[in-house]
């Protein structure tokens, strides 16, 4: 017999009535279950032994045959076959239905599948099936139409009128006849013609009908099979009946549901034999339909069937659905034996690969192994005696347990397991007590602490499982974080503090300035107390004296040999950098040795130095009062401006918040400065924060500075700050304000955890079948990577972006012409350094986004596996790693939606512009006007600048060795100075000779400016670093006059488009344009010159505050109106988790911007239906219409030239628009940048390739826009590879290929549309997925991980891949010659 598990694909179809009868071992005729006296199954009942098999092993029902030797004999008295009782798990029965019944999945679920085939609505279908209306099947030669519905009266009338010349009927029989009469081929071609004729080709109903018809044709299912004549009865062991204490029975709900069906079926059969009146028969048929519906899906009905305890009964569908359903409860997650759990405590004495296991627990877990050893050692001779010995806990048992445990790994898991490092293997060490001991350095990977956390222990039993634990899961093999390649095993808290203390330098202590020949002398001096740990000394290293401290010598002495001398104060970051460096240079074995040394040293010296905190360590700066007084003065001035009406209420609020944030920042800086100087840097609070052991600048600020501004529950900032700190104590009002944020914090955390968990689940589902399957897909496409900058600050270097990837193109040294990097070569750290040295700033690399492997990805496109720092192996489940890498930090992301000017940005809003580097202004772009003392930008603008890296006066140069504008790299001779020495370049850039200066400058860069910015420099100016070059209003966006003249209002009508508000606080009148949209009114301001001509026009958006009067004279640069930033309250910046969710689900943002579809000239048209029409005239003179909601702030004006993809009004970008206008590559870049932005702001580092894997899955499908000669349907969404494959076949046969456009689908939808129906069904909407899959006769190729777990195969990754399955091991012994 072929091994049952040895199959490669699985198919799902609709079972035909014959198929169901084939499966069956007999018909269930009675609704009885078991006899209440004998407790044996009733004959022909739901548990009948004749049908389902015997309940007693190798014995028939009546007891005539009792032995295994009669196997297979059918008893002549009771007709029961002599078999094993386990057949009751697999033998099915059936019920012959007295009337056909429709299957609820195919008629009730929306869209109704039967309804689509017959083209009738769901309600009409229901009325036919529930015997309310007749349907005309054959109209004959009458006036009736086929499929026409008739109620009782109409039917009687038609019969009287036409007699028997037409055929009409009701119930499932009628539907069955209609389905049998369908000609699918004819219907398909008819619908295809209809689709071509219809101009609106994307008629969804037509598309759905065509898809269903094609699916029926391909799968070989017959439509009439959706109507059932025979009902299968599942095996009795799957719907068991068990006796409880007290003689009562507990039974599966399915038995009750089956009994209702059998009772009604039998009753109907009797009524049909008796020729009962039609109305009674019809009612019984309807009840039969209802009972079968309840059996298949009880929860989907309006009136659910309830059991004795008035709870809804669980039907077959309910058993599959949801978290408690078969898929998620029993198939994807199972409870495991040989496991235990206990509280964890710290085990500082353990080695990195060890964990402490309580002896009692170990004895229980390893019991079978101990029993086997006891019997082998002949201490006992049977299992029962061995168990007794174990219970008595005699000495031999402990000795044997020690032997058993040696080199038998165990797995430790801490819930929640957010990434693969949540389960690791350790070698157990027996410990007393009942708590598991955990190594302190692995806490970070588990996110564990010792405040009562519990962990589970699992014992891998088979040799293969043990080998896998040793080779792959041992804690020492998991030193790096798979998300980014940074070490995940590193010291924190006490250890960091101990090492920080040890390696710090202190002035004026014992032994300062002494010289030592070697390390041993230093340690002797310390032991003799003639040298302080923190004393600055000189030690001979590699033949020369080096200045260091005694503590650093101790640290370096303890490190493994070969690691270069570490001569700095070690904070947590420094330690992580050190671990990283040692890993790269010396490999993991040295790192493991070093980590245990670091742990040991850290704990020892933290104990030795024993730092404590007292109130006197918390130093409140004396300047605090001055700062607060100054802030109050500034606020008084702001209030005064507000009272005069110079600024609006929102500007006032924003300014006040800004003042307090600045004050708080200044005070914090001062406080940290004071703490740093206190006790020469040995202030304990400062040390804890500076070393990164515990606490942060923010927390110290609350202790010794001021608590600062608090946020309300809504996320708004309360403008009244808490000026006190915890040392001074809070006043009553301050305490009350500070309670505001606390509750929100707790609620957020609870919601966030569930949200992040769900995000991970969706990501795992979409990416679970992405496995590295081949070595090289042979693509020639790649993506461009360059350094990510914010202004001048480098956020992510080229190294972080490209290291570990493969290059697409060959790169040569621009000067020597030699090949630095070949095509398809891995970009190592050394290569990147070389590239940076020769000035390469952009690279095209292979990426998962452009991989062309048919399934999964290829090795070359994926690049490096970060958890091992080596190229990825074939068989690595990179999809799941990607999902975990993105989901795991999800719990750290905030939930709060920030307001503009709220905590999110207020810190950075400054009203002055200055740049860090010196630069030369090359040019200006954007609309600007000249005013008295500078240039005023009336709209957004750009400065074209070149940064100056190096400058020298030409008079100090003897001979210049380079040309003007020449590109130079590091190490190139630039000039010979007056002293005759050759000066080499230490920068990459361009030479610029100007006036009497020699500069090295960068490539031209752009700096964006806001509207209303006043620039105080001119083109061509050389500007020193840090100099203020311009000012702007951070809290309002002005609309500025670009010409001189008189103001003329158009459609600005008081009470309609203009609202005058009298400010109750100040008594000033504020004029505001309303948000209301009127068809005919378009509020604008014209500027008229002296001759009465209109020279400029300005559209006024909703919520703009007017600053001018009608008829008033105006000069260039005057403000006409301003938009307060506060009025952008509605546009909350969705931060953190909700933003990531929106991006992965590709939701259309609320406050949407309109992007220019083409490049061209803007033309303003009228307002239609509340939307402003803007045309863009492209280079061919074609107009492209854009509709923008009136009242939105426009970013373009009439006559402007725009590029495709430019924003026409403010708002958020819709990712679908990016795909449509700018294409797939731009969309990938957009999504990648947006998602990374959220994580980067939270300080989380995730490599691009992980996000790339998910985006690749989201863009897997294409939409058919032209069918050609293929079998596709217009508007159908198909997999890219299916599309290419079909086209290839059509082209080979000389046909016309189909055309498709790329589409973007959110993660939930993608998971449901995945090729594997098992995976999709186990994700969400189980019944819907199975319904569609059965109609299409889908085949699951079992490629992904989930589907293999469900059916009980090994997952197809690593050694479970088909690649390795077929390997045969054979011994090849050479015979001696």
UniProtKB/Swiss-Prot annotation:
Biological process (GO), any one: DNA-templated transcription
S-S bonds: none
Annotated keywords: DNA-directed RNA polymerase, Magnesium, Metal-binding, Nucleotidyltransferase, Transcription, Transferase, Zinc
Residue numbers binding Zn(2+) 1: 60, 62, 75, 78
Ubl conjugation in keyword set: no
One Pfam family cited in the UniProt record for this chain: RNA_pol_Rpb1_1
Cofactor names: Mg(2+); Zn(2+)
GO CC field: DNA-directed RNA polymerase complex
CDD domains: RNAP_beta'_C, RNAP_beta'_N
Catalytic activities: RNA(n) + a ribonucleoside 5'-triphosphate = RNA(n+1) + diphosphate
Binding site for Zn(2+) 2: 777, 851, 858, 861
Molecular-function GO term, any one: zinc ion binding
InterPro entries xrefs: DNA-dir_RpoC_beta_prime (IPR045867), DNA-dir_RpoC_beta_prime_bact (IPR012754), RNA_pol_asu (IPR000722), RNA_pol_N (IPR006592), RNA_pol_Rpb1_1 (IPR007080), RNA_pol_Rpb1_3 (IPR007066), RNA_pol_Rpb1_3_sf (IPR042102), RNA_pol_Rpb1_4 (IPR007083)
Entry's cofactor comment: Binds 1 Mg(2+) ion per subunit. Binds 2 Zn(2+) ions per subunit.
Enzyme Commission (EC) number: 2.7.7.6
EC category name: transferase
Residues involved in Mg(2+) binding: 449, 451, 453
Subunit structure and binding partners: The RNAP catalytic core consists of 2 alpha, 1 beta, 1 beta' and 1 omega subunit. When a sigma factor is associated with the core the holoenzyme is formed, which can initiate transcription.
NCBIfam families reported for this sequence: rpoC_TIGR (TIGR02386)
Family the entry assigns: Belongs to the RNA polymerase beta' chain family.
PANTHER family linked: DNA-DIRECTED RNA POLYMERASE, DNA-DIRECTED RNA POLYMERASE SUBUNIT BETA
Biological role stated in the UniProt entry: DNA-dependent RNA polymerase catalyzes the transcription of DNA into RNA using the four ribonucleoside triphosphates as substrates.
Name under which the protein is recorded: DNA-directed RNA polymerase subunit beta'
């Amino acid at each position: 017999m072929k091994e049952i598990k040895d199959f490669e694909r699985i198919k799902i179809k609709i079972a035909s009535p014959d198929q169901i009868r084939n499966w069956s071992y007999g018909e269930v005729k009675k609704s009885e279950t078991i006899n209440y006296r004998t407790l044996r199954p009733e004959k022909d009942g739901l548990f009948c032994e004749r049908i389902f098999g015997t309940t007693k092993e190798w014995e028939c029902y009546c007891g005539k045959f009792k032995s295994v030797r009669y196997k297979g004999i059918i008893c002549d008295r009771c007709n029961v076959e002599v078999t094993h009782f386990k057949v009751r798990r697999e033998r099915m029965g059936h019920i012959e239905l007295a009337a056909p019944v429709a299957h609820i999945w195919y008629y009730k679920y929306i869209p109704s599948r039967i309804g689509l085939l017959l083209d009738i609505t769901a309600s009409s279908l229901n009325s036919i099936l529930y015997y309310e209306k007749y349907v005309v099947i054959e109209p004959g030669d009458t006036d009736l139409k086929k499929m026409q519905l008739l109620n009782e009266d109409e039917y009687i009338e038609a019969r009287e009128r036409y007699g028997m010349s037409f055929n009409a009927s009701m119930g499932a029989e009628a539907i069955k006849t209609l389905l049998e009469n369908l000609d699918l081929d004819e219907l398909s071609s008819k619908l295809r013609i209809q689709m071509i004729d219809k101009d609106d080709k994307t008629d969804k109903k037509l598309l759905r009908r065509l898809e269903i018809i094609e699916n029926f044709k391909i799968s070989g299912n017959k439509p009439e099979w959706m109507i059932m004549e025979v009902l299968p009865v599942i095996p009795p062991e799957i719907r068991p009946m068990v006796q409880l204490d007290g003689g009562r029975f507990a039974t599966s709900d399915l038995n009750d549901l089956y009994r209702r069906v059998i009772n009604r079926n039998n009753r109907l059969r009797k009524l049909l034999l008796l020729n009962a009146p039609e109305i009674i028969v019809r009612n019984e048929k309807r009840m039969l339909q209802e009972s079968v519906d309840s059996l298949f899906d009880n929860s989907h009905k309006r009136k659910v069937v309830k059991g004795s305890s008035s709870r809804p009964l669980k039907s077959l569908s309910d058993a599959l659905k949801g978290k408690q359903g078969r898929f998620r409860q029993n198939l994807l997650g199972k409870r495991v034996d040989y496991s235990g759990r206990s509280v964890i405590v710290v085990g500082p004495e353990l080695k990195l690969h060890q964990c402490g296991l309580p002896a009692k627990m170990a004895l229980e877990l390893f019991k079978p192994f101990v029993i086997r050893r006891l019997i082998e050692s002949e201490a006992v001779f049977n299992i029962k005696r061995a168990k007794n010995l174990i219970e008595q806990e005699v000495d031999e048992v402990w000795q044997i347990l020690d032997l058993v445990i040696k080199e038998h790994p165990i797995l430790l898991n801490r819930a929640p397991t957010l990434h693969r490092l949540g389960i690791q293997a350790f070698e157990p060490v027996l410990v007393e007590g009942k708590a598991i001991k955990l190594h302190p350095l692995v806490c970070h990977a588990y996110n564990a602490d010792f405040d009562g956390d519990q962990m589970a222990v699992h014992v891998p039993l088979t040799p293969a499982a043990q080998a896998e634990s040793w080779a792959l899961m041992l804690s020492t093999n998991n030193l790096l974080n798979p998300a980014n390649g940074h070490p995940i095993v590193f010291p924190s808290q006490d250890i960091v503090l101990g090492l920080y203390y040890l390696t710090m330098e202190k002035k004026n202590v014992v032994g300062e300035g002494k010289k030592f020949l070697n390390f041993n002398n230093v340690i002797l001096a310390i032991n003799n107390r003639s040298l302080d740990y923190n004393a600055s000394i000189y030690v001979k290293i590699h033949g020369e004296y080096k200045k260091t401290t005694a503590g650093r010598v101790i640290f370096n002495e303890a490190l493994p040999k070969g690691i270069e001398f570490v001569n700095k104060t070690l904070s947590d970051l420094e330690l992580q950098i050190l671990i990283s460096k040692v890993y790269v240079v010396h490999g993991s074995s040295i790192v493991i040795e070093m980590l245990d040394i670091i742990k040991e040293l850290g704990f020892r010296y933290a104990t030795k130095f024993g730092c404590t905190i007292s109130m006197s360590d918390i130093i409140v700066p004396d300047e605090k009062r001055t700062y607060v007084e100054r802030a109050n003065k500034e606020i008084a001035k702001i209030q005064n401006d507000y009272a005069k009406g110079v600024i609006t209420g929102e500007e006032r609020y924003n300014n006040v918040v800004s003042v307090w944030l600045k004050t708080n920042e200044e005070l914090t800086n001062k406080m940290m400065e004071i703490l740093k100087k206190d006790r020469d840097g040995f202030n304990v609070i400062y040390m804890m924060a500076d070393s990164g052991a515990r606490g942060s600048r923010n927390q110290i600020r609350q202790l010794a500075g001021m608590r600062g501004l608090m946020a309300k529950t809504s996320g708004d900032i309360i403008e009244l700050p808490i000026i006190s700190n915890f040392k001074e104590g809070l006043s009553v009002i301050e305490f009350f304000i500070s309670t505001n944020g606390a509750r929100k914090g707790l609620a957020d955390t609870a919601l966030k955890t569930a949200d992040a968990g769900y995000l991970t689940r969706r990501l795992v589902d979409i990416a679970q079948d992405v496995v590295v399957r081949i070595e090289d897909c042979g693509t020639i496409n790649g993506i461009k990577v360059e350094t990510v900058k914010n202004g001048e600050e480098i956020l992510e270097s080229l190294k972080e972006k490209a290291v570990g990837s493969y290059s697409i193109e060959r790169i040569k040294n621009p000067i020597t012409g030699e090949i630095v990097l070949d095509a398809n070569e891995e970009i190592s750290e050394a290569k990147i350094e070389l590239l940076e040295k020769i000035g390469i700033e952009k690279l095209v690399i292979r990426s998962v986004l452009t991989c062309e492997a048919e399934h999964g990805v290829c090795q070359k496109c994926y690049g490096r596996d970060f958890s091992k720092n080596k190229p990825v192996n074939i068989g690595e489940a990179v999809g799941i790693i990607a999902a975990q890498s993105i989901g795991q930090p999800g719990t750290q992301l905030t939930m709060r939606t920030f307001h503009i000017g709220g905590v999110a940005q207020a810190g950075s809003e400054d009203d002055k512009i200055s740049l860090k580097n010196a630069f030369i202004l090359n040019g200006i772009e954007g609309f600007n006007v000249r005013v008295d003392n500078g240039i005023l930008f009336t709209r957004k603008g750009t400065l074209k600048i070149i940064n100056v890296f190096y400058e020298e006066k030409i008079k100090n140069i003897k001979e210049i060795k380079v040309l003007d504008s020449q590109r130079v790299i590091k190490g190139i001779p630039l000039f010979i100075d007056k002293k005759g020495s050759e000066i080499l370049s230490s920068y990459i850039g361009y030479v610029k000779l100007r006036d009497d200066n020699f500069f090295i400058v960068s490539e031209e860069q752009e700096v964006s400016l806001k509207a209303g910015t006043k620039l105080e420099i001119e083109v061509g100016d050389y500007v020193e670093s840090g100099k203020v070059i311009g000012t702007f209003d951070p809290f309002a966006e002005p609309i500025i006059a670009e010409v001189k003249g008189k103001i003329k209002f158009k459609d600005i009508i008081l009470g309609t488009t203009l609202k005058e508000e009298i400010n109750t606080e100040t008594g000033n009148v504020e004029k505001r344009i309303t948000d209301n949209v009127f068809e005919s009114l378009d509020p604008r301001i014209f500027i008229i010159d002296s001759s009465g001509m209109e020279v400029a026009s300005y559209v006024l958006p909703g919520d703009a505050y007017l600053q001018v009067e009608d008829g008033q004279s105006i000069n260039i640069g005057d403000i006409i109106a301003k938009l307060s930033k506060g009025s952008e309250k509605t546009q909350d910046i969705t931060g953190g988790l909700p933003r990531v969710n929106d991006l992965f689900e590709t939701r259309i943002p609320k406050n949407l911007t309109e992007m220019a579809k083409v490049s061209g000239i803007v033309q303003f048209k009228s307002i239609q239906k509340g939307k402003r029409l803007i045309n863009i005239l492209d280079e061919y003179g074609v107009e492209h219409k854009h509709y923008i909601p009136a009242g939105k702030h426009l970013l373009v004006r009439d006559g402007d030239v725009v590029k495709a993809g430019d924003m026409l009004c403010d708002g958020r970008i819709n990712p679908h628009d990016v795909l449509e206008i700018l294409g797939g590559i731009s969309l990938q870049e957009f999504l990648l940048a947006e998602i990374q932005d959220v994580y980067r702001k939270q300080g989380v580092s995730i490599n691009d390739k992980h996000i790339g894997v998910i985006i690749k899955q989201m863009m897997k499908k294409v939409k058919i826009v032209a069918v050609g000669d293929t079998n596709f349907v217009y508007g159908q969404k198909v997999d890219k590879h299916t599309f290419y494959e079909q086209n290839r076949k059509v082209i080979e046969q000389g046909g016309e290929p189909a055309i498709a456009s790329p589409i973007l689908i959110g993660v939930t939808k993608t998971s449901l549309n995945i090729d594997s129906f098992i995976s999709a069904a186990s994700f969400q909407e189980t019944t819907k997925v199975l319904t569609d899959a059965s109609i299409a006769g889908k085949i699951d190729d079992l490629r992904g991980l989930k589907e293999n777990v469900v059916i009980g195969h090994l997952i197809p990754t690593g050694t479970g891949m088909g690649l390795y399955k077929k390997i045969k091991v054979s011994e090849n012994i050479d015979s001696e010659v």
